[in-house]
Regions:
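An N-terminally biased module of ancient metal coordination in phosphate/nucleic-acid-related enzymes
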Residues: 1-70, 153-156, 160, 173-178, ...
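Extended substrate/RNA-proximal surfaces in nucleic-acid metabolism proteins
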Residues: 49-197, 258-263
Length: 267
């Protein structure tokens, strides 16, 4: 049985609507998924209808700052209706909109024609808006051939149209997830540039062992989980963005036996 516990939808920086992603997961033969959109629980607001045959673990991926680097914290089994997570999602959404508008202004100052109304319209669906949405607009207007090129040329961190954003501390992210009844796991450690040891001292409940950027380190992170008595998770980090691996749901997935304790956490 295959699962994917790290996926993104249009509610944050993915391409597809939650219903579309869920159906793609079913079509790919996945039995369990978790939609872990960045800093929002909009996929779980009750307006989306998912296939009955698919188990979905409520999740989120929170953005934190440690040592000037973006450290992501995955939350599983959160209560999407808990006031703490609802409040965070609302506040983050407003900050994200402000940031998106600032990036639009930068693009306009650079000579691009961008419609602010399109950005605001995206917010009507209850999710967040960010660089991928702006990049998609730039591609649609013919400025660049694909989303990756927009990031490489314009929206990369420190790029001509980039605007920094406020992030919680790692501790704050873990506390928020716990308040909402969930468990907090360190996301994709293979992507972290600084030394891991100080980060591993935070009160995580687990670690994302299986991730495309962790290749070559699966055994190392598995041993770490055993040493710390941590839960193990894994997923594709699927966004549906062209030229970003994996390009299809189910290409990178995890055997359920490798994440059995997490799957049975609430049984």
């Amino acid at each position: 049985m295959n699962v994917d516990l790290h996926m993104h939808t249009h509610c944050s920086d993915g391409v597809y609507e939650p219903e579309q992603l869920a159906q793609m997961a079913v079509d790919a033969g996945l039995a369990v998924i978790s939609i872990t959109d960045h800093d929002t629980i909009a996929a779980y607001d009750g307006s989306h209808h998912f296939p009955a045959s698919l188990r979905i673990i409520p999740g989120i991926e929170l953005s934190s700052d440690y040592g000037g680097e973006d450290i992501h914290v995955l939350g599983y089994y959160i209560d999407p209706h808990h006031e703490a997570i609802q409040s965070y999602s609302r506040q983050f959404r407003q900050r994200r909109l402000k940031r998106a508008m600032q990036m639009v202004d930068k693009c306009i100052s650079l000579g691009y024609v961008v419609d602010k109304n399109q950005i605001e319209a995206l917010l009507q669906k209850g999710g967040t808006v960010g660089r991928p949405h702006l990049a998609k607009m730039m591609v649609e207007r013919g400025y660049y051939p694909d989303i990756k090129t927009v990031f490489d040329k314009l929206l990369y961190r420190g790029g001509p149209a980039y605007i920094p954003y406020h992030r919680y501390t790692v501790d704050q992210c873990i506390d928020l997830i716990h308040q909402a009844g969930g468990i907090a796991l360190l996301a994709h450690p293979g992507m972290i540039k600084q030394k891991l040891d100080p980060i591993l001292q935070f009160q995580f409940d687990g670690i994302e062992v299986y991730h495309p950027e962790n290749r070559g380190h699966f055994d190392e992170y598995s041993r770490l989980a055993v040493q710390k008595h941590w839960l193990v998770s894994g997923g594709s980090d699927y966004h549906g963005v062209p030229r970003r691996y994996p390009e299809q749901v189910g290409v990178f997935c995890v055997d359920a036996d490798n994440v059995r304790e997490l799957l049975q956490y609430r049984d």
